[in-house]
């Protein structure tokens, strides 16, 4: 039996009742969630907790929050999985959780970890080495983004998630350092946009060729650029609407819908095409979060 106020949520979105029950039923004994089955991982656990919180569920989400709390690293970040001693970009997802539920001190340490993280190409050591080699920095390296793993280059996905976490914290408690990193991260995204709009996972050009955009990264970046009005964002929205009509990936459609919702550009009455199935627990959780966002409860920024 799923705890909390899930019946109220199910009346608002009839198709979600089974999804919520199924999601709760997939919880491991340790309190975490797997991607499909088996070992608990941080990413699916955070998405599951966010989805259950959006539905008003408290019992299983509470167990998930305790699992997350137990896996904090000494440096204030979170690993991809228990037993791994390196904090990763999944810390940004954890920082999206309400501090009053995660624990204010733990949440604050996660925010501090994000503020101290940047892609390797933005570090003083890297830039000095490039200068000594006579290599001029590329235009897409001017602003710092976030890497998947410390000590590596910045990518669009982790940068988008870090922006969301820091912007959410800045709305809660405005601070200059939060605002500065959010603004720099958004400039990073604009510089990394593909020539015809949208975003690839990383570089604008690779091996001498223009990079092509992907639907999931385009949706993530647009979500992180909520409130930004520019020609670049307008071009990206056009690409996102095209992707929405063409792609059949649950993950991609989840992020595209969230990205378009952030700019009030999701077509009225849009429904996911028949036959599109959630193949992982993060897919199912994100679909629930899209449904909640369409009803005014978006845990990515509220």
Question: What annotation goes with each model-predicted range?
Answer:
Residues 1-302:
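Preference for long, amphipathic alpha-helical scaffolds in soluble/luminal domains
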